[in-house]
């Protein structure tokens, strides 16, 4: 699942861009039978009933939304909250503002390599991604001959255009060291694997320079920011 941190900067939501904005995105999980057990639009009434069981919370909610819990107000509230999930002040942010000591020499070399390879062409904007849709298999068979699923169609599932097949929203690179697994199909478990895939399928390189990979990883790790003044941390939730 894509991270919700900095999602407010994305032009579209989800890997396939099926949600035009945060509010549409917020309406997806509640009506996904796999995620929350509901499926039909009428199920918002059941969700509202559960939320109303907490009378104190319901009273507070009505101070902002006098009409109470509805599909519209619930998703609007979630979207407004997600707009606060911004993670500025990463070491790289501080470096760009003039603090030469904010990142290591290897990270600086990695940044120069990032630019040399043209990575910023797609990973652009305040979130360093989320602005465009690109082909996963631009320079090679990303899927490696494996059986493809409907999710592998990418943007085509939304636009119904054959030319959008295998196009996916470029992910943000902010906090990327914490947002594994990578790719739309979670086929890369580490940054090194993700970079290797990009080298091959996006840039068309057959041979991989391990030193360059280490430099790029050093740079990418400087993109981890802060939330409400505290460093963002990656914590694995226990299985239910």
Predicted regions and their residues:
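Periplasmic c-type cytochrome electron-transfer domains
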Residues: 1-240
């Amino acid at each position: 699942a894509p991270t919700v941190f900095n999602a407010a900067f994305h032009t579209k939501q989800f890997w396939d861009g099926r949600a035009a904005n945060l509010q549409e995105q917020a309406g997806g999980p509640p009506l996904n039978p796999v995620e929350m057990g509901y499926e039909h639009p009428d199920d918002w009434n059941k969700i509202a009933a559960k939320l109303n069981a907490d009378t104190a919370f319901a009273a507070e909610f009505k101070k902002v939304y006098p009409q109470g819990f509805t599909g519209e107000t619930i998703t609007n509230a979630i979207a407004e909250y997600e707009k606060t999930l911004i993670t500025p002040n990463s070491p790289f942010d501080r470096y760009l503002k003039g603090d030469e000591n904010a990142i290591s020499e290897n990270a600086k070399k990695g940044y120069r390599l990032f630019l040399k390879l043209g990575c910023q062409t797609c990973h652009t904007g305040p979130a360093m991604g989320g602005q465009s849709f690109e082909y996963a298999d631009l320079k090679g068979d990303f899927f490696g001959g494996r059986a493809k699923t409907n999710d592998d169609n990418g943007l085509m599932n939304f636009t119904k255009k054959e030319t959008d097949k295998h196009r996916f929203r470029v992910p943000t690179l902010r906090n990327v060291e914490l947002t594994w697994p990578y790719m739309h199909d979670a086929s890369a478990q580490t940054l090194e694997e993700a970079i290797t895939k990009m080298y091959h399928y996006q840039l068309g390189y057959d041979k991989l320079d391990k030193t360059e990979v280490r430099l790029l990883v050093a740079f990418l790790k400087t993109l981890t920011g802060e939330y409400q003044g505290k460093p963002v941390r990656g914590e694995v939730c226990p299985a239910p």
